[in-house]
Amino acid sequence: GILDEGSFEAGFGFDGSSVRGFQAINESDLILKADLETTVIDPFFAKKTIAFLCDVYDPITHEAYGRDPRGITKRAEAYLKTTGIADTVYFGPEAEFFIFSNVSYEVGPNVSRYYIDSHEGFWNSGSNDASMVYLNRIKEGYFPLPPLDKTHDVRAQMVEIMEKMGITIEVHHHEVGGGGQAEIDMRFDTMLKMADQVQLYKHIVKNVAARNGLLATFMPKPLF
């Protein structure tokens, strides 16, 4: 539908029963209200598109929904002030991820398997592709230069978009995992701001990878 001033005052209804851990199907209605301070231009659409984060509200009581992660974060920050320990808390999560060139999986009555591949995987040393001569050894992928670091340019694209969308980046580099493990570090910020940024960060990483015909995952140990 068309956005107008009323849209932002009344909010946008959605089915809370379709969000795991939110509502039962017999009382599923919830409301999203946009936080306009989070508005960004999302570059991953063919047409110019704005995106913003929202807070969840109960449509009956018009109060903040108790299970909304942003609402919980705001209450945690408010509680901190009441303790007298501090007025502000800063977080600087070290978000790491893998960039893979191919992933497939299958689960059936007679089969269960998964397959992961990376242009940097040491297991590709027997390939006829000349570029596969440059492969990181097992657990020796920390800070290599190209051509060992084959994901540098993709990470640089991610960083460029992150900074355009308001995320301050301190450093990016290859990580120890030789098969495409990467790290892009954000500068620390307040709890809510950082929580919002992590969601945007993941959105950017996955979409830039997809643009390059790759797949990014934040699974902790897809490779051992």
Protein language model features and the residues they cover:
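ATP/Mg2+-dependent ligation/transfer catalytic cores
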Residues: 1-170, 191-200
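Acidic, glycine-rich loop-and-beta core segments that form the ion-binding/anion-interacting portion
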Residues: 181, 186, 193-224
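Short, conserved phosphate-binding/catalytic loop or strand-edge motifs used
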Residues: 95, 175-184
